UniProtKB/Swiss-Prot annotation:
UniProt name for this protein: Protein SOX-19
Listed SUPFAM superfamilies: HMG-box
Any one Gene Ontology molecular-function term assigned to this protein's record: DNA binding
Record key words, sorted: DNA-binding, Nucleus
Lineage: Eukaryota, Metazoa, Chordata, Craniata, Vertebrata
One GO cellular component term: nucleus
Keyword Phosphoprotein: no
Record has Nucleus as a keyword: yes
UniProt-listed InterPro entries: HMG_box_dom (IPR009071), HMG_box_dom_sf (IPR036910), SRY-related_HMG-box_TF-like (IPR050140)
Designated gene of the protein: Sox19
Main location: nucleus
Length: 55
């Protein structure tokens, strides 16, 4: 997921010792709290990449 890759890097920079499972939990919570209008660009980019890789 495009958004999670970007956000994961941010979390890892702030908390380099945080376990991957905890990072994933935080990312899931953050994603659920994002309003749809903020999610749409990332969803569209993920779809574009999916189609590109299928070609």
């Amino acid at each position: 997921m495009v958004w999670s890759q970007i956000e994961r890097r941010k979390i890892m920079e702030q908390w380099p010792d945080m376990h991957n499972a905890e990072i994933s939990k935080r990312l899931g919570k953050r994603w659920k709290l994002l309003p749809d209008y903020e999610k749409i660009p990332f969803i569209k980019e993920a779809e574009r990449l999916r189609l590109k890789h299928m070609a």
